[in-house]
Protein backbone atom coordinates (compact mmCIF):
# COMPACT_ATOMS: atom_id res chain seq x y z
CA UNK A 1 0.00 0.00 0.00
CA UNK A 2 1.46 3.41 -0.92
CA UNK A 3 2.63 5.59 1.96
CA UNK A 4 0.13 8.29 0.99
CA UNK A 5 -2.95 6.00 1.05
CA UNK A 6 -4.13 7.67 4.28
CA UNK A 7 -4.65 10.90 2.31
CA UNK A 8 -7.48 9.43 0.21
CA UNK A 9 -10.73 10.22 2.07
CA UNK A 10 -13.01 7.35 3.02
CA UNK A 11 -15.94 9.09 1.35
CA UNK A 12 -14.19 8.72 -2.00
CA UNK A 13 -16.25 6.25 -3.99
CA UNK A 14 -13.87 4.12 -6.07
CA UNK A 15 -11.33 6.92 -5.84
CA UNK A 16 -13.80 9.63 -6.95
CA UNK A 17 -15.01 12.70 -5.08
CA UNK A 18 -17.46 15.39 -6.19
CA UNK A 19 -16.78 18.70 -4.50
CA UNK A 20 -17.98 22.28 -4.84
CA UNK A 21 -15.24 24.92 -5.01
CA UNK A 22 -15.66 25.62 -1.29
CA UNK A 23 -15.48 21.91 -0.47
CA UNK A 24 -12.41 21.61 -2.71
CA UNK A 25 -10.70 24.32 -0.66
CA UNK A 26 -11.58 22.61 2.65
CA UNK A 27 -10.51 19.21 1.35
CA UNK A 28 -7.22 20.70 0.12
CA UNK A 29 -6.56 22.17 3.56
CA UNK A 30 -7.29 18.78 5.16
CA UNK A 31 -4.94 17.15 2.66
CA UNK A 32 -2.23 19.66 3.53
CA UNK A 33 -2.66 19.07 7.27
CA UNK A 34 -2.38 15.29 6.76
CA UNK A 35 0.58 15.42 4.36
CA UNK A 36 3.89 14.05 5.57
CA UNK A 37 7.06 14.81 3.62
CA UNK A 38 8.57 13.68 1.41
CA UNK A 39 5.47 13.73 -0.76
CA UNK A 40 4.93 14.61 -4.41
CA UNK A 41 1.34 15.37 -5.47
CA UNK A 42 0.50 15.79 -9.15
CA UNK A 43 -2.47 17.92 -10.20
CA UNK A 44 -3.89 17.31 -13.66
CA UNK A 45 -6.88 18.82 -15.43
CA UNK A 46 -7.84 21.41 -18.01
CA UNK A 47 -7.12 25.13 -17.67
CA UNK A 48 -9.37 26.71 -15.06
CA UNK A 49 -10.43 23.47 -13.38
CA UNK A 50 -8.95 24.43 -9.99
CA UNK A 51 -5.42 23.03 -9.87
CA UNK A 52 -3.90 26.21 -8.47
CA UNK A 53 -6.83 26.67 -6.07
CA UNK A 54 -6.24 23.17 -4.74
CA UNK A 55 -2.47 23.78 -4.51
CA UNK A 56 -3.12 26.99 -2.53
CA UNK A 57 -5.41 25.13 -0.14
CA UNK A 58 -2.95 22.27 0.35
CA UNK A 59 -0.19 24.80 1.12
CA UNK A 60 -2.42 26.66 3.59
CA UNK A 61 -3.29 23.42 5.39
CA UNK A 62 0.38 22.42 5.38
CA UNK A 63 1.25 25.61 7.24
CA UNK A 64 2.57 27.96 4.55
CA UNK A 65 1.96 31.52 5.76
CA UNK A 66 2.86 33.35 2.55
CA UNK A 67 0.45 34.15 -0.26
CA UNK A 68 0.48 31.27 -2.74
CA UNK A 69 0.55 32.41 -6.35
CA UNK A 70 0.59 30.51 -9.62
CA UNK A 71 4.12 29.66 -10.76
CA UNK A 72 3.09 29.65 -14.44
CA UNK A 73 5.78 32.14 -15.49
CA UNK A 74 8.43 31.39 -12.86
CA UNK A 75 7.76 27.63 -13.21
CA UNK A 76 8.76 26.97 -9.57
CA UNK A 77 7.84 28.72 -6.34
CA UNK A 78 9.36 27.64 -3.04
CA UNK A 79 7.61 28.26 0.27
CA UNK A 80 8.55 27.76 3.91
CA UNK A 81 6.51 25.59 6.28
CA UNK A 82 7.34 24.07 9.67
CA UNK A 83 7.28 20.46 8.39
CA UNK A 84 9.44 21.04 5.31
CA UNK A 85 9.90 23.29 2.30
CA UNK A 86 7.09 23.31 -0.26
CA UNK A 87 7.76 23.44 -3.99
CA UNK A 88 4.87 24.43 -6.25
CA UNK A 89 5.77 23.66 -9.86
CA UNK A 90 3.76 24.52 -12.97
CA UNK A 91 5.06 22.75 -16.07
CA UNK A 92 2.50 24.22 -18.50
CA UNK A 93 5.12 26.32 -20.31
CA UNK A 94 7.76 23.60 -20.33
CA UNK A 95 8.78 22.84 -23.90
CA UNK A 96 10.68 19.60 -23.30
CA UNK A 97 11.38 17.22 -20.40
CA UNK A 98 15.07 18.14 -20.71
CA UNK A 99 14.24 21.60 -19.32
CA UNK A 100 13.43 19.92 -16.02
CA UNK A 101 17.15 19.68 -15.32
CA UNK A 102 17.46 23.48 -15.44
CA UNK A 103 14.65 23.75 -12.87
CA UNK A 104 16.53 21.57 -10.40
CA UNK A 105 13.89 18.85 -10.86
CA UNK A 106 16.01 15.92 -9.64
CA UNK A 107 17.04 17.77 -6.48
CA UNK A 108 13.48 18.92 -5.77
CA UNK A 109 11.78 15.54 -6.22
CA UNK A 110 14.42 13.74 -4.17
CA UNK A 111 14.30 16.28 -1.32
CA UNK A 112 12.42 15.90 1.93
CA UNK A 113 9.71 18.33 0.86
CA UNK A 114 6.10 18.63 -0.17
CA UNK A 115 6.11 19.00 -3.96
CA UNK A 116 2.98 20.04 -5.89
CA UNK A 117 3.19 19.67 -9.67
CA UNK A 118 0.66 21.13 -12.10
CA UNK A 119 0.72 19.77 -15.68
CA UNK A 120 2.83 16.73 -14.64
CA UNK A 121 2.31 15.04 -18.00
CA UNK A 122 5.03 17.36 -19.31
CA UNK A 123 7.53 15.63 -17.01
CA UNK A 124 6.87 12.32 -18.78
CA UNK A 125 8.89 9.50 -17.24
CA UNK A 126 10.73 11.70 -14.73
CA UNK A 127 7.96 11.51 -12.14
CA UNK A 128 8.76 9.23 -9.21
CA UNK A 129 6.58 6.12 -9.00
CA UNK A 130 5.42 6.86 -5.46
CA UNK A 131 3.62 10.15 -6.14
CA UNK A 132 -0.04 10.91 -5.37
CA UNK A 133 -1.90 11.71 -8.61
CA UNK A 134 -5.00 13.92 -8.39
CA UNK A 135 -7.04 14.54 -11.53
CA UNK A 136 -9.62 17.36 -11.53
CA UNK A 137 -12.48 17.64 -13.99
CA UNK A 138 -15.68 19.65 -14.33
CA UNK A 139 -18.45 20.43 -16.76
CA UNK A 140 -19.92 23.87 -17.38
CA UNK A 141 -23.42 22.87 -16.23
CA UNK A 142 -22.26 21.30 -12.93
CA UNK A 143 -20.84 23.47 -10.11
CA UNK A 144 -18.88 20.56 -8.63
CA UNK A 145 -15.41 19.35 -9.48
CA UNK A 146 -14.86 15.64 -10.01
CA UNK A 147 -11.70 14.54 -8.27
CA UNK A 148 -10.07 11.24 -9.21
CA UNK A 149 -7.59 9.96 -6.66
CA UNK A 150 -5.25 7.11 -7.31
CA UNK A 151 -3.90 5.90 -4.04
Where do the PLM segments sit?
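Short phosphate-coordinating micro-motif centered on Lys-Gly-acidic
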Residues: 2-19, 60, 95-101, 106-151
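Pre-Walker A adenine-sensing motif
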Residues: 25-34
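Short hydrophobic/aromatic beta-strand immediately N-terminal to the Walker A/P-loop
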Residues: 40-42
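P-loop (Walker A) phosphate-binding loop of NTP-binding proteins
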Residues: 44-46
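Conserved lysine of the Walker
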Residues: 51
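Short beta-strand-centered segment that lines the nucleotide-binding/catalytic pocket of NTP-utilizing
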Residues: 64-79
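Switch II (G3) loop of P-loop NTPases
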Residues: 86-96
